[in-house]
Amino acid sequence: MSDSENEGPPQLSSYALAALQEFYAEQQHHHSDLCGDDKYNIGIIEENWQLSQFWYSPETATCLAEDAVAAAGEGGRIACVSAPSVYQKLRERHRDDVSVCIFEYDRRFAIYGEDFVYYDYKNPVDLPERIATHSFDIVVADPPYLSEECLRKMSETIKLLTRGKILLCTGAVMEDAAAKLLGVKMCKFIPEHTRTLGNEFRCFVNYNSGLDCNLSVQLPVQEGPK
């Protein structure tokens, strides 16, 4: 038997071992965040640009969430279709006030349990039986791609889910297509993202919305956790 066969398994240097321990600690901390109340923080699940994911700023997500709550009414049902930032704000601020579902292609959002509904816009009406048609007071939707095909297919889903009210967030270039497909009009409010986008982004609604009052929306004061 050679000397090399007697050496045993390779040993990590103290530097490599410390780096590995730090990595495991970070992973454990991240896992703890995903299991606790912090799982509703925007950015707790990182953007995947390959899926065209760009999160709203906390201020914008809050404005959209509050407008959706006002539109849905007390005890209302809200569907967030490809709009996870809005879902997270709804759950953070109105955990007991409204019922919310998050429709997402990205299965990482399955951490939200029964709220999560797997959704692929390419199969717009392929939804689980537990999701009844026209069962949501408002649908908040953000098509992942700026194309008429994507908007047209997602519009099928929106019309299948909503009882009437629609809050659509997409590029300004989709204004005519959005009006044609969903009967929505552009709001004055200008949404912002955590990263600067190359295209002008706007909100569109088909109801009397606070988002249409001003370019910046006054955020309501929250009286303690809910």
UniProtKB/Swiss-Prot annotation:
Chief subcellular location: cytoplasm
Provenance organism: Bos taurus (Bovine)
Reaction(s) this enzyme catalyzes, per UniProt: L-lysyl-[protein] + 3 S-adenosyl-L-methionine = N(6),N(6),N(6)-trimethyl-L-lysyl-[protein] + 3 S-adenosyl-L-homocysteine + 3 H(+)
Source organism superkingdom: Eukaryota
Name of the protein this chain belongs to: EEF1A lysine methyltransferase 1
Keyword Ligase carried by entry: no
GO biological process: peptidyl-lysine methylation
SUPFAM superfamilies to which the protein is assigned, alphabetical: S-adenosyl-L-methionine-dependent methyltransferases
Sorted UniProt keywords: Acetylation, Cytoplasm, Methyltransferase, Phosphoprotein, Transferase
Signal peptide extent: none
Similarity annotation: Belongs to the class I-like SAM-binding methyltransferase superfamily. EFM5 family.
Modified residues (N-acetylserine): S2
Family matches, as HAMAP family: Methyltr_EFM5 (MF_03187)
Subcellular location: Cytoplasm
GO molecular function, one term: nucleic acid binding
Residues modified to Phosphoserine: S2
GO CC field: cytoplasm
Regions annotated as coiled coil: none
Function, as annotated: Protein-lysine methyltransferase that selectively catalyzes the trimethylation of EEF1A at 'Lys-79'.
